[in-house]
Curated annotation (Swiss-Prot):
It comes from Chloroflexus aggregans (strain MD-66 / DSM 9485). Its EC number is 1.3.7.7. Keywords: 4Fe-4S, ATP-binding, Bacteriochlorophyll biosynthesis, Chlorophyll biosynthesis, Iron, Iron-sulfur, Magnesium, Metal-binding, Nucleotide-binding, Oxidoreductase, Photosynthesis. It catalyses: chlorophyllide a + oxidized 2[4Fe-4S]-[ferredoxin] + 2 ADP + 2 phosphate = protochlorophyllide a + reduced 2[4Fe-4S]-[ferredoxin] + 2 ATP + 2 H2O. It is an enzyme of class 1 (oxidoreductase). PROSITE patterns: NIFH_FRXC_1, NIFH_FRXC_2, NIFH_FRXC_3. This is Light-independent protochlorophyllide reductase iron-sulfur ATP-binding protein.
Amino acid sequence: MSLILAIYGKGGIGKSTTSANLSAAMALKGAKVLQIGCDPKHDSTFPLTGHLQPTVIDVLDSVNFHLEDVSKEDVIRTGFAGVDTLESGGPPAGSGCGGYVVGETVKLLKEFGLYDKYDVIVFDVLGDVVCGGFSAPLNYADYGLIIACNDFDSIFAANRLCLAIAQKSQRHKVKLAGIIANRVDYEYGGGTSLLDQFAEKVGTKVIGRVPYHDLIRRSRLAGKTLFEMEGPGKEECTRPFEEMAEYLLAQPQATIPNPYHDRAIFEAIGGWR
């Protein structure tokens, strides 16, 4: 049975770049990995493949939504380090329900029997959990991961995600494996001071600290993982992913989080330094 990870975080926090590099790091350590992009923008797997691939919704539309006419080869592409990739896609902007498409993609994986064919399956899910469709990966995941940075909005979203994981854990096996700190800047951004306090309060920990570095920006523009890039800072940028891969492929010290109520988190963050 696969190790299933569901990665969430505030919109624009860097989930896709982080997910792709984490998938690559686990693959480089010998794991057979499938990364699934769960966002209508369908750009989650771009750093692994170097292009935007056909989505589940594109393929279904081409066969008039006859599921029996779709094979896994129609929707899966192989990227860097042998990572298999899949994008759920979604309706055009301003129409339809992206969450519904994510829910249908989860069902499709079951139809193809993919849950037993990989060592690791990574769900990269957009933004906050705002509906049942986008929370569907938590029904199958062993662990949730939250990506955040050291600011108010990011931590507020992380708290709501902790609430979603805590609620799902009442009926499913999912637990929180930890928080990934992204864009860590010790000179101007306070490092991870707020995130560390938040993690301790809700009963988890920061499992990785990804630096704020131009190499990461350039890797995204190039459609490459950090492991394929050259230049100053490469080791500094790749090391956190290697360490997180080791942590997740072993037995993570996962917990059921104890989040704040919305009003309480406002008051709490204001008192942290």
